[in-house]
């Protein structure tokens, strides 16, 4: 019965596709061949060229999505939701403690798209705080307790309703066990006590994947969150260069950096670096880059004096030097940025100087993203998003993050590649303009630190000591209208 249903659905899909092409011919008097028809080695799930049907795109995509979701159970027995752990063959490339580095892989036979994800998890910058990290967060420094398989969510999910454009790609998850923002190339020494080989781990994983199907890939998307997002910026061009050197120049490499775009701004409250969490970003990276023996891209390194390579860890400084296309996802009020700036929102009420600092942080971050061609920056108080199951719900100006990524993907395909203009109705440079945290109604929920209860935007602002009368006056609005806007 199930087999008959699947065959029927497949026939229906082909009927719609053929019927659609006939309709397109009548409307446009020409057919743009689909990438199915152009590709030589097999295609993706639904890699159609919709250029001729921009007017009916939403209806057609809804039909395709519905059919994809209906067909998904047909292949459920063949698709394994779990990613399997593989230890690196090259045992000299290790985690901090000398245990073998590795990666989790879910293969998707027939797909020529690969998503390689770099996990995040802060860093350590001295023997002392690395020892503490090893005692309290050992899985971020050692592979000895990694499970043999794992499942993932968000852009790593195999469910089309949760991951509409990447669910059928080959998915690779590289656990973070180098504590060096994916930048180190240093083996374990007696002085350091640990190995820092983040960049080398990425290189070894890519080399091994060539023997597992990456050699026939069309696209490799190097993605990462938090420290992994910064790792994307540091390594995306290296991966592209590596593949070219190994004889695979036809594999296009792109980057997706989530919550890894930090500012080296002045802290709200200055502290020394005894606590790694509240250490100023610039000082932390300056110390870390020496301890890790970090490698930064040569094009970025050349922009700064010797000894100032730490600048390349900050997105707005390295981005102009990158050759590979990169999409930047960044909360305007990132919790990790606020933490290193010593802004503690759990305390109430927030002083006016702190409130102004928070608003200014949003403005500064927005300014650093204005020249980034592909970006998604909601005015929310959060950290990381692309591996969250709710990642499809966040919107900026009515466009969701998966949709923005899809539009970016389309813009990089022929014949759109050389166009400087975004495709009509398909934006991928999206930033909120409202000036305070959680002013975007699609932001993830905030919870009270003490009660655990969800808070509305108004409750959250009141919790911070928000002066409704004063803020309404600043915005030129009546207090009641301001609260109405915040509540909607």
From Swiss-Prot:
Checking InterPro entries in the record gives: PAE/NOTUM
Localisation: Secreted
One biological process term from GO is: negative regulation of canonical Wnt signaling pathway
Glycan attachment residues as annotated in the record: 90
Going by the UniProt record, its keywords in alphabetical order are:
Glycoprotein, Hydrolase, Secreted, Serine esterase, Signal, Wnt signaling pathway
Into which EC class is this enzyme placed? hydrolase
Q: Which cysteines in this chain are paired by disulphide bridges?
A: none
Determine if Hydrolase is one of this entry's keywords.
Answer: yes
* UniProt EC number: 3.1.1.98
According to its UniProt entry, the function of this protein is described as:
Carboxylesterase that acts as a key negative regulator of the Wnt signaling pathway by specifically mediating depalmitoleoylation of WNT proteins. Serine palmitoleoylation of WNT proteins is required for efficient binding to frizzled receptors. Functions in the prospective ectoderm and is required for neural induction.
**Name recorded for this polypeptide:** Palmitoleoyl-protein carboxylesterase notum1'
Name of the coding gene: notum1'
